[in-house]
Amino acid sequence: MGESVLEEESRHLRQVHQRIGQALEQAKESVQKSDREYMDTKRYMVEHRGDIDPHEMFQNELLLKQTDRTGAMAVEILERLKKLKDSPYFARIDFCEAGQGEPFSYYIGRFALNHDREPLVFDWRAPVSGMFYDCEVGPAAFQAPDGRIQGELTKKRQFKIRGGKMEYALETSSHIQDDVLQKELSHTSDEKMKSIISTIQKEQNRIIRNENQGTMIIQGVAGSGKTSIALHRIAYLLYRFKNRLSAKNVTILSPNRVFGDYISNVIPELGEEPIYELSFEELAEIQLEGRMGFEPEQDLDQEGDADESRSGDPGESRGKSRSSDPGRGERERFKSTLEFVRLMDAYIEMLPDMVFAPKDYTFGRFRADAKWIGKRFKAYGTFPVKRRLLMVADDIRDRFDTENIMEDELPRQGGILKSLASMLTMKNTLAVYRDFYEKIGKKELFVMADKKTLEWADVYPFLYLHAAFEGLKESGITRHLVIDEMQDYTPVQYAALNRMFPCQKTILGDFGQFIHPNHLHTLEDLLHLYEGAEFVRLNKSYRSTYEIMTFAGHIRAASGLEPVKRHGDVPGLVSCRNEEEELCRIMDLIRDFRSGDNASLGIILKTHREAAELYDLLSEEFEVHLIEPESTRFSSGISVTSVKMAKGLEFDQVIVPHASDRNYRTDHDRSLLYIACTRAMHRLTLTFSGKRTGFID
């Protein structure tokens, strides 16, 4: 009887492990050698500090830096080998190149591994590895650096290796076998997002390996894996263009620090350095540092249409809501539209002529007339107004130097700049921003929180005008920007971002998961801002069971959504007589969770305030984590949070409290409830007192 696939592959795995073990010993020796050489050089420099001439000292410093770099590389190789030992590869393809006699076996893993210059494992991003994701057994091809390679794929296998042990080895003719995908999707969620290289689907692979240099916009339904795909795309681009793109050249803009922590493992897990990540608020702080303050973005229960308390009494709303500031909602809606950007663009086009009134400049016998100064100012039309003044000041000095026959003292640039600044009719961006609202006849739509504090809705419009008047801090190092949760940002925020980051972008999100009741922009508005961008849709949802996604589909129909047919429990509805009983039932559900196999439970409430109140009650009996706007870490276990903070996260099990018709009743509430329910992977329960929301009837 012939050897089974599992026996054959287990034997091969033992051979690979043996070679990894040898490589590990060599790597450990390299690390120790580098440490010894570094310490020896350092000791020599200290002991002979007074005796070494400057040239030798310089050579020793160079040697020290080189030894340090070598040691860092050795440590990196060692860490990579440790990861490979646990799970060296996840697939095998046998490919016979046209004109060649025998097929070659390619084992595919997270990292490449060579032994005696022979490849043992190929990086999942290598050109040949793409056939695993794209091709079935039969005629196949891949794009190599030297051209397209044709041939035949004679074998495809998939493996699960964990802790160095082969759990399964399956023969397959197609891409990812359904049972493999089902096994991976049915696992409990780990503490943070993990790589998906063993289950990347064909349509996902096309996005990941897309090498176009422009902007890509990904519209993906809940659970489609869009964030993970975007991160894998970055890892692929870092591999493919390693000579001109490194991790320090990539920035991720995410909704909050918790989400940034949640996704932080993916890129390092794929063998790359961590990526710089920041939020829109942090970016605004960098740009406005020392100039203006701003209010943080309002909680949902502080926004006009978002929430009246669960009692149904609008007067019980917390915070600075519509009852205390009825104009806030109108201001936010006006500034969230594409038309608002068009108004700003029209104003910016007129701004230089409105704000600069050139006059004659004299210094002793030297004179630069107003007409000449005006021409020089217009010549620098692509620059912000105040930067143009610097350039005109340089031109005046150059002209003075040329015409200075009598060799008079050269005027100081600061003095020239002061004279030019006096020709401005408005002195700072705040004055310009006020003038914009006066010019469009909407003076009442600009209200400051206090003398030096902007409302959040004004921050990015202010920065957009600041870019035209004084100039923004541009990121010269960022060559690729990733923007997640694209539907939560307004057109003017994108317009300002384009000034700060004039680079390639990957923009992703789901316009079916709106979180802001006062934002009026659409996917079409975003596509208008990025004309020529490559646009892709992801309609297949992998996160939740078929039953959960079917349930969520009754709350809000997602156009084109295709749930993977992974079956589980029907979502539970728990009716309670009052809120006291509801709290008891939630505690019972927590006890059930703790006695089961699931690793993470998300208790998702409508607002931060509701989440904080329930957390205070639950924390007396259970170990729970409160995820709030100030949080910086995501932890497994039991988390209590708001819909806004839960966006992008996933949990094995989800409880949605207060799912009553008092709490979830507006169209915006419908979207919030949909988001909360689609965070669940395996089990979903909604609790309510009184009458349940009509969205789940």
Where are these regions (language model features)?
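P-loop NTPase Walker
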Residues: 1-35, 39, 183-297, 320, ...
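Extended, charged low-complexity regulatory segments
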Residues: 1-197, 201, 205-206, 693
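Domain-scale macromolecular recognition modules
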Residues: 85, 91-93, 100-103, 470, ...
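A structural signal for short, well-ordered beta-strand segments and their strand-loop junctions
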Residues: 92-94, 158, 217, 252, ...
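Hydrophobic side chains in beta-strands
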Residues: 93-95, 161, 346, 575, ...
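Conserved phosphate/pyrophosphate-binding and hydrolysis machinery centered on Walker-type P-loop NTPases
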Residues: 186, 190, 330, 334, ...
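Alpha-helical nucleic-acid-binding subdomain
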Residues: 238-481, 488-496, 504, 512
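Conserved helicase motor core of SF1/SF2 NTP-dependent helicases
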Residues: 248, 257-265, 269-273, 278-285, ...
